[in-house]
């Protein structure tokens, strides 16, 4: 996780969720704002990536695939990173399902958040102009017997190699460059993330999406 926003991630999440009321032939129907956005095939990945959040995102993607396998899914990311296994469950589902998953960075996409941002469908990875992106190597700390520490150290090196391989594929950078740039926290602006290959387009207005998709 990035120390850049560590203090903010410790704050309790906002419990007040806005409700949206729609008029239907059967009368009024109320949705929380996230359920309403899900109807528009929009999913939010916000905060630290952990198992419960990952399960919810996977379930939403599978639901939207079952509802319409031809329409894109839009994954909005504002995350400081989190647990690798949780993030990889989201990543694998993104690659597994039939619909394209378009990724949009709002705020920040750090660590696993940046990895998932880069994993969006080709030519459908976006970043808002003042968002920040950060890539680095996996973090891990272990306690116990020396033999157990050695086992975990070997495992995290395997995970690091696998994530670097995948990042090289999605960014079209060489593995050597990825290994060098992720050795320490590597922050990028929206434009720098575009040049690096983490996103395809920096959006300033809604119409930018349509204009870019026509290219």
From Swiss-Prot:
Keyword check for Zinc, yes or no.
no
Q: What class of enzyme is it?
A: hydrolase
* Annotated S-S bridges: none
The record's annotation in Gene3D superfamilies points to:
2-enoyl-CoA Hydratase, Chain A, domain 1 (3.90.226.10)
Q: Which UniProt keywords apply?
A: Cytoplasm, Hydrolase, Protease, Serine protease
GO CC term, one of those recorded: cytoplasm
Q: Which reaction does it catalyse?
A: Hydrolysis of proteins to small peptides in the presence of ATP and magnesium. alpha-casein is the usual test substrate. In the absence of ATP, only oligopeptides shorter than five residues are hydrolyzed (such as succinyl-Leu-Tyr-|-NHMec, and Leu-Tyr-Leu-|-Tyr-Trp, in which cleavage of the -Tyr-|-Leu- and -Tyr-|-Trp bonds also occurs)
Quote the subcellular location field of this record: Cytoplasm
- Which Gene Ontology BP terms does the record give? protein quality control for misfolded or incompletely synthesized proteins
Highest taxon listed in the record's lineage: Bacteria
**Which GO terms of the molecular function aspect are on file?**
ATP-dependent peptidase activity; ATPase binding; serine-type endopeptidase activity
Q: What family is this?
A: Belongs to the peptidase S14 family.
Q: Which HAMAP family does the protein's record reference?
A: ClpP
What protein is this chain from?
Answer: ATP-dependent Clp protease proteolytic subunit
